Amino acid sequence: IVMKHLEQRVGEEDFRKGMREYLSRYAYSNADWNDLVHILDELEPSDLRVWSDVWVEQPGRPTISLQREGDGQPGIVLQQTDPWSRDRVWPQRLEVAFLSDSESDAPRLLHRAQVELRGASVEVPIPAAARDAKTVFVIPNSGGVEYGLFEPDPASLSFLVERHAQLEDPLLRGVAWLTLWDAMLEDRLPPETLLSAAVLSIETEPAEQLVSRILTDVTQTYWRFLTESQRRRWSGVLEDAVWSAVEASETRTRRAEFFTTYIELASSREAVARIGRIWSGEEDVPGLSLSQRDRIAMARVLALHEAPGWRQILDAQASKIRNPDRLAEFDYLRDSLDADPEIRRAFFESLRDPANRHREPWVLQGLANIHHPLRAPAAIPLVLPALEMLEEIQKTGDIFFPAGWLAATLGGHNSPEVVEIVSAFLAARPDYPPRLAGKILQASDMVERAARISL
């Protein structure tokens, strides 16, 4: 996205010239972002260093809100604010889509306007093509490359909730979904409303990339942003919608993705029982041949839910695994799935020995099992020890291991208690390595949001 905005700022031809010069000048040496900015600024002086400082060097993103002008003023205002209160401005070109709705037809795209947002705000007139519409709805980031937290006006947000799935342009549908997701994360849209919107898309969305994103967000919303009573209300609705999509899918890839989501979402007695029947071979998944990894995933879920005979299910699954590496992984993870919290704690304590962290993907899966939302309350006492081990994890593991360790540890939690543990850990260590502190803040961001929203 940054490169696209850089190209827009200097122009396509100068951008190409600059890239050629950059690659030629530094073909056999080291170069960084600032070297590219310097070359482009020489070609087309336009305060690129100031632009780069805000866009690249400093953290944060703008909040861009859409406001309707008063009666008799046919237009909208796009207001840009700096959430860090530093009065920064992110100059960029926005593509603003104007749409109308109809009860009998799909929403109609009336006009796309190119808008230059150079300061704190910009007024955008309602285009002539939209003035006869009874109600005009606006998507301020319809180009797909705009950067920021975009906040539509209430009418447009409601329109996206109810009608995003009927938008003809797949890019607009994708932008609409991301806008709804951001609205939920910012507590402007209730999680249950987001799930209602998702149900409209699950069966009908033809774009596989967008389906994948929606299913990921649905799973996270269900497990982290709903209260237990809300999950009980929504379990059957989501399970039925996803299973219907399994049956209706026309491609194996699509069917497999829906079935994977069904396994991850299953929490009602009926859904867990169905997974048990599929695992045992009593029931088939229409049009889908299950792999051994699928059956291992089902056995894992049955153990997490402590389904009747879960120990025997794990024993039976182990007896069917012929690949020695896969069997070793399965055996390694057994204790992380146990119903006894003390056995799970012992698994965690074993990770203090570097020899038991040799297979890092196995370690991360074990932590994810321990901290699964179903087991999260019992796992809270293990959060602080995991944070205390982080510096050693960085020294003894792969470069990506610390981020994975944190994601697996915090990924199932949504309680204020865990938020407080993380905050107290960092507050007590003012000299903690900045990179690791940043990773902790990044991993805990969703915990904080979920704790606040799901209260």
Please report, for each region that a protein language model flagged, where it lies by residue:
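Amphipathic alpha-helical substructures
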Residues: 1-77, 190-208
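Beta-strand-rich binding/interaction modules
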Residues: 48-49, 61-139
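Generic structural "secondary-structure junction" signal
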Residues: 57-58, 96, 152
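Long, ordered, helix-rich scaffold segments
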Residues: 86-88, 99, 106-109, 125-455
